[in-house]
């Protein structure tokens, strides 16, 4: 067959056109060039020192002997967990709380929430509210009168807002206790709130901590002892005046009872009462509509102890409601 005869034959898909062999040769040349360039770069950089990040990675994750076997993988030797170092980044310290809302003429005895107890409650609230350093007084029995309806009315402005609320109660014996509420108190036909809620109490005790032999096996609460403040001295005290007779110092023990998860009876409010936690026929904290009588018993929602030293039923002489995060 002559050369002209070969040109007249129909082209097949395998031999069609003359551009394919040329493009294939160019691609092959480019691939070889890139391969040699990469090898040259790799061999030229082998003599460089490893970075600190590479060294740290090798120290933490590579446990190989001279033969390349992993000696700490649990098979060829005793397993060793990865060595981790603490991050140097630390959150800034929280600013001290500032309590707003007490009137100028309110006596100190009528101020139920102290700064020390408020700081303890602060450690238990959600992180988004823990950084808030301003708490505002919504309702005070001393300043606004004994009425649950007034308390509800003052809370309506916070509807739909992601704020936190601290309920403070003082009984006839001077005990201070209460609850943290994830929603504002309002009359409702069903329970509301979530697992962020908790009950708490603060009681005066002697400065001595509990003995080391105390049984803490079934302890289901947070317990903190707050030292009493140092006695203040007057700068202009007359030299002839006699010092007051010393009185035994007192400390405050703070206990919190977080959500147990046994039920969802966190908050229940009606026009006739306000309650926090229930189950087993008992309320964790219950107040009547006149804010005169209260009940507190162990409940399933928080697994708490009775909050008042008077017993399961107590008389009320003070109520406050604080808000944060607005």
Curated annotation (Swiss-Prot):
Residues 111-325 form the TLDc domain. Its main location: mitochondrion. GO terms for biological process: response to oxidative stress. One of its GO terms (cellular component) is mitochondrion. The keyword Mitochondrion applies. Signal peptide: none annotated. Residues 10-26, 214-226, 233-248 have a biased composition (Polar residues). Keywords: Mitochondrion. Residues 1-26, 209-249 are annotated as: Disordered. It is found in: Mitochondrion. The keyword Mitochondrion applies. May be involved in protection from oxidative damage. PANTHER family: MUSTARD, ISOFORM V (PTHR23354:SF62), NUCLEOLAR PROTEIN 7/ESTROGEN RECEPTOR COACTIVATOR-RELATED (PTHR23354). Belongs to the OXR1 family. This is Oxidation resistance protein 1. It comes from Gibberella zeae (strain ATCC MYA-4620 / CBS 123657 / FGSC 9075 / NRRL 31084 / PH-1). The lineage of its organism: Eukaryota, Fungi, Dikarya, Ascomycota, Pezizomycotina.
């Amino acid at each position: 067959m002559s050369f002209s005869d070969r040109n007249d034959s129909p082209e097949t898909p395998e031999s069609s056109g003359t551009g394919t062999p040329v493009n294939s040769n160019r691609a092959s040349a480019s691939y070889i060039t890139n391969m040699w360039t990469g090898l040259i770069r790799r061999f030229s950089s082998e003599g460089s020192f490893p970075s600190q990040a590479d060294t740290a990675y090798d120290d933490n994750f590579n446990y190989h002997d001279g033969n390349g076997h992993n000696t700490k993988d649990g098979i060829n030797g005793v397993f060793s967990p990865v060595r981790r170092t603490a991050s140097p980044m630390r959150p800034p310290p929280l600013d001290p709380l500032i309590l707003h809302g007490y009137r100028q003429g309110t006596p100190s005895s009528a101020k139920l929430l102290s700064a020390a107890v408020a700081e303890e409650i602060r450690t238990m609230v959600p992180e988004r509210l823990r950084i808030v350093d301003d708490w505002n007084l919504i309702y005070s029995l001393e300043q606004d009168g004994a009425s649950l309806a007034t308390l509800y009315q003052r809370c309506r402005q916070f509807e739909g807002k992601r704020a936190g609320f601290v309920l403070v109660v003082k009984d006839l014996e001077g005990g201070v206790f209460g609850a943290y509420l994830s929603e504002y108190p309002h009359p409702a036909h069903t329970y509301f709130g979530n697992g962020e809620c908790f009950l708490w109490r603060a009681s005066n005790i002697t400065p001595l901590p509990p003995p080391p032999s105390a049984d803490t096996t079934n302890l289901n609460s947070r317990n903190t002892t707050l030292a009493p403040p140092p006695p203040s001295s007057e700068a202009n005290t007359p030299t002839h005046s006699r010092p007051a007779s010393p009185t035994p110092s007192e400390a405050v023990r703070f206990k919190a009872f977080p959500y147990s998860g046994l039920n969802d009876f966190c908050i229940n409010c009606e026009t006739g009462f306000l309650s926090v936690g229930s189950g087993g026929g008992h309320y964790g904290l219950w107040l009547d509509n006149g804010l005169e009588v209260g009940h507190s018993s162990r409940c399933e929602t928080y697994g708490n102890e009775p909050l008042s030293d008077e017993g399961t039923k107590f008389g009320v002489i003070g109520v406050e409601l604080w808000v944060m995060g607005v």
